[in-house]
UniProtKB/Swiss-Prot annotation:
Membership in a protein family: Belongs to the glycerol-1-phosphate dehydrogenase family.
Binding site for substrate: D131, D178, H262
Coiled coil spans: none
Superkingdom assignment: Archaea
Protein name: Glycerol-1-phosphate dehydrogenase [NAD(P)+]
UniProt xrefs under InterPro entries: G1P_dehydrogenase_arc, G1PDH, Glycerol_DH
Matches recorded under CDD domains: Gro1PDH (cd08173)
UniProt-annotated binding residues for Zn(2+): D178, H258, H274
UniProt entry tagged with the keyword rRNA-binding: no
Amino acid sequence: MDVTHDMNGQKKWMQLPRNVVIGNGVINEVRDVCTDLKLIDNALVVTGKSTKGIAGEIVQDSLQDAGQNVELVISESASMKEVERIRKHAIESGTKYFLGVGSGKTIDVAKLAATDLEVPFISVPTAASHDGIVSSRASIKDGKTTTSVQANAPMAVIADTEIIANAPYRLLAAGCGDIISNCTAVLDWQLASRLQNVQFSEYAAALASMTAQILIDSADSIKPELESSVRMVVKALVSSGVAMSIAGSSRPASGSEHMFSHALDRVADEPALHGEQCGVGTILMMYLHGGDWKKISDALKLIGAPTTAKELGIEDKYILEALVLSHTIRPERYTILGTGLTPDAAEIVARKTKVIS
């Protein structure tokens, strides 16, 4: 952890990863990273069913070859019940540190369990679907409700571009949507700072905005199965995570567009991916801000991410329900949604932006 000072000169903790390793084949460097961090025994690898063979067992074998005691456990859902199950397993096995190996959900479960036990955590993503792979936040579901929970940032991030490039491209495109959503998140944060004197960090906001803009400007170069695309997106996700750590909150990367996504999770029969929904939410919220929503839509189209309800696989009526509900998701967080949209206003926004037809 690093110590910094806020605008009033008060101390606050800033958590940042010590090591970030990105590249082809870097999963084979996991034991070197652990050795560098003085993590030398009693590791718990938390992975998923599908990612166990892709990366989980590679990490386990690598650490065991280095003489470490390593256990591997399969995480089946991103719920508090699952976090508690993993936590109990870790206590019983004397775990000294965690490695979350897999998707964002698996990483969030490992991150929270490690935070609860106050032990180090290393993030080893097999997909780049959202900024949870590096942030100090975790998204946990309770039924149809998704909650963003404060956690410790990973001590290290090991992102193997070859593995991530082989994941379904839809996941990478979703990660782009999550990054581009910084555009409206920062606008919401600025608005809250002006109207409600919410603490605002110019550094965090600038980093989050720049990260999103670089991705928008490079949208036509992000393609399936290209490691160069993966490197760009992973670096952007890392930057977003760092922006949140600097801010001490998720404000630089989570605003009204994320509230819309969480509202969709509640009302839709089959929600889309988090980053996909945030991307569409960014189009809608940029319209409300009076910004260039078409630029957002065009960038998402170039990347191959959804820009309409149909492309999300969600009925128009759920888009409208989510828009009306969005302001209630985090009522303490002021955004462009204010006290909420009327059903008529929601329909105008959705039709003007062509999110619904």
